[in-house]
Amino acid sequence: MKNIISLVSKKKAASKNEDKNISESSRDIVNQQEVFNTEDFEEGKKDSAFELDHLEFTTNSAQLGDSDEDNENVINEMNATDDANEANSEEKSMTLKQALLKYPKAALWSILVSTTLVMEGYDTALLSALYALPVFQRKFGTLNGEGSYEITSQWQIGLNMCVLCGEMIGLQITTYMVEFMGNRYTMITALGLLTAYIFILYYCKSLAMIAVGQILSAIPWGCFQSLAVTYASEVCPLALRYYMTSYSNICWLFGQIFASGIMKNSQENLGNSDLGYKLPFALQWIWPAPLMIGIFFAPESPWWLVRKDRVAEARKSLSRILSGKGAEKDIQVDLTLKQIELTIEKERLLASKSGSFFNCFKGVNGRRTRLACLTWVAQNSSGAVLLGYSTYFFERAGMATDKAFTFSLIQYCLGLAGTLCSWVISGRVGRWTILTYGLAFQMVCLFIIGGMGFGSGSSASNGAGGLLLALSFFYNAGIGAVVYCIVAEIPSAELRTKTIVLARICYNLMAVINAILTPYMLNVSDWNWGAKTGLYWGGFTAVTLAWVIIDLPETTGRTFSEINELFNQGVPARKFASTVVDPFGKGKTQHDSLADESISQSSSIKQRELNAADKC
């Protein structure tokens, strides 16, 4: 903060003698050029070594001219760059404690918006658990070869496909709604629609009605999937980003724990009543109304407002997000706003300000889109599907129904513990490390589960169940939590929402494959693999781990501006952590840049001479 106050003091002093300072600054900068050799400079110009451009972000320098007005504009741009650098440095050096003291409201607003994902986690776990509920099986199922009722594989696939297709429709609609009305009103609209769609599920008379209710309810869920992560990443500083984006995973787990507890109660107390499946559907009405009220009062993302050229509103939004008061708060708001403006302006210069889906696949953005998509696909290609079918899996592994529901509840609680564990270790190791080690442990668990499928008796089924609990812990301590942060950090600011939408669509496409295959793997009347399913997913996890090691960069400790620069420079994945970048430059004039270039060339020549002398 001392740096901020010092910076503002300097600006105030400069503003009192503005015209005089501009002229003096011009003369001082020109005088400084005597430090480097004019002949080298002229020769460099001939060789096009020093190409003079006007003030652009691609040069990190500005050209001083003969006009005082032009020089004033140049120096204003230099000051803006200094402001952005100051904000970037402040964000990087901020500790978790400092971030919580300075941005407590940002954290709370982020938590509120992400809580919408509780409903999706709840319904995802609910639908899978209903397949194992006796009253639901008798009401909507058919007799199998063993003389018991079950929901056929075809209907399980169909219902799951309805959810995934609805989510993909919702994701596509979300991108256009956000462009038109912003994050807040898009989420409020989605919550209102969800409230109406729940009626279809509550009054369902057939699996076809459930299918209609699921596909319609999934449209708002698609909105929540993309906007919760986007909002959290844009309102919170670097020190809070991992915690607030991975909180999305905690919301999923809260929903799944809630669903498991309700389904356990239904199995024990409402096993022969239609309320056994109606009550779980009805409880979804708890969430929308309070969330709609809370989100209405939430500030809009300042990044979205700047992208829409609504800078004054972005300033107000930042003022609501930041704590403090008086001049100190105003200074911090100005610096942060300038950082956002310059980051977005630089992206627009590089991408010709085109924000279409096609731009997500062009040039540097193509790499960023690929990484975001494959990172989210990795959640579905590493055996996580078994966690969604845990109750059904436990039954097919030989457990009694009541014990299977108990194990599922324990599984989700362990998943919550795993996510909290990832919060602890994220302060010590990077995102990439958390992801790779998490996948490695998952792979081991899955292969052992698959091996136990060749055994028989209660010991084998209990062992497989215990390892599925361990799988839940490692999944949520690793890829389950960290993916939300990585997917939010990888895209550019201009294309963040669209890239996250594309990534989530890819996630859902992989989930479609899982939804088709998994019921066949587990159902007695089909492939009946049981615990052997672990071998299949262990192999997929190994492939996923290999891709992460080779292609996924480390973004820990990087601001959005620095991540942009790393991608623009084409830095290889394994060099992201060690590469030093200067996203905004240092507010230099072109003369400063030429001097630096000359000094750099001179140093390079001297180094070559020393190397030649050493060889001799």
Swiss-Prot record:
InterPro entries, alphabetized: MFS_dom, MFS_sugar_transport-like, MFS_Sugar_Transporters, MFS_trans_sf, Sugar/inositol_transpt
Glycosylation sites (chain numbering): 523
Protein name: General alpha-glucoside permease
Origin organism lineage: Eukaryota, Fungi, Dikarya, Ascomycota, Saccharomycotina
Topological relation to the membrane, as annotated: Multi-pass membrane protein
One matching Pfam family: Sugar_tr
Region (Disordered) residue spans: 15-40, 587-616
Species for this entry: Saccharomyces cerevisiae (strain ATCC 204508 / S288c)
Record NCBIfam families: SP
